[in-house]
Amino acid sequence: MKIADLMTLLDHHVPFSTAESWDNVGLLIGDGDVEVTGVLTALDCTLEVVNEAIEKGYNTIISHHPLIFKGVTSLKANGYGLIIRKLIQHDINLIAMHTNLDVNPYGVNMMLAKAMGLKNISIINNQQDVYYKVQTYIPKDNVGPFKDKLSENGLAQEGNYEYCFFESEGRGQFKPVGEANPTIGQIDKIEDVDEVKIEFMIDAYQKSRAEQLIKQYHPYETPVFDFIEIKQTSLYGLGVMAEVDNQMTLEDFAADIKSKLNIPSVRFVGESNQKIKRIAIIGGSGIGYEYQAVQQGADVFVTGDIKHHDALDAKIHGVNLIDINHYSEYVMKEGLKTLLMNWFNIEKINIDVEASTINTDPFQYI
């Protein structure tokens, strides 16, 4: 399996297009033509993680957090430059799966909920998928070759189906004028043509490509076409809602997940004895969604990186919070390893996958 094949597999299961626009995901360092010798999953790509990959003989690291994020202005032999230089020197490919893994139904938040032993887990804050229904009108004799070209270029696909078109027949009218150069008809004469309306669906990212291909392969000098926007609730969403088996107090639940996640500290906001049943989770840094979580029925909102003023606001408004620290996302190392092994087994791919043993939490606790 080459890196390009791995990227295709990852994009199929955890689409990079679902990442936030500000994010930097995908193949950050590497060569698509290189064969994969092994995959190491990591929360962060630190120098220690790179050394671990080298020791194992693995040439691919998949990290959750992008190493190249804010922009690199130099590649000196220190700091981030040292890490990047070592990756390149040892021909190690680096792939980032950040917010696309956050919003995935099997991603980080699902992994956290399962690690906490919760049940009835479902995605919240679902994204809106934007599609377009494309319709254009073409002379009957040109329909076949036109559809062939669109299909060859990846349009009119629905899941595992290609060449997904709908046709309806009718008559078109037009009159070429001025400097027109008509394929059919004569200048200043109204022309009636047996035409077919062709309809097909595309993803939002294919819109400009579809317009280009229609203009390129349509026989008319000035083809008529429409893009009709359609929005649907996506399977992807930032966060999950889940439940404990039996009601617990806020303090007991905080202590329970501290133990299950094996993290050194947990903070919480709210009355210690308040009963907890439904839990909303956004791993990493999810502040800003706590009030939506309450509106959706959560008794407590679990996330990391909670600042003082956000915590105070929540306390004043009676919103329960639990801060499990950003590093709690480390569960994705084993979680992504399991996903990769399952996908590889389905495709009959024999490549070693391991979760990094390196603790990349920058904090020390006393």
From Swiss-Prot:
PANTHER family: GTP CYCLOHYDROLASE 1 TYPE 2 HOMOLOG, NGG1 INTERACTING FACTOR 3. Belongs to the GTP cyclohydrolase I type 2/NIF3 family. Zn(2+) 2 binds at residues 65, 326, 329. Zn(2+) 1 binds at residues 64, 102, 329. Toroid-shaped homohexamer that has a central cavity of about 38 Angstroms diameter. It holds the Pfam family DUF34_NIF3. It comes from Staphylococcus aureus (strain Mu50 / ATCC 700699). GO terms for molecular function: metal ion binding. This is GTP cyclohydrolase 1 type 2 homolog. Keywords: Metal-binding, Zinc. Is organized into three distinct structural domains with interconnecting topological connectivities. The two NIF3 domains at the N- and C-terminus of the protein have the same overall fold as canonical NIF3-like proteins. The middle region of the polypeptide (residues 126-236) bulges out between the two NIF3 domains and is structured as a classical PII-like fold. The two entries to the central hollow space are capped by the two PII-like domain trimers. The trimeric PII domain may play a ligand induced signaling role and probably regulates the function of the NIF3-like domains. GO terms for cellular component: cytoplasm.
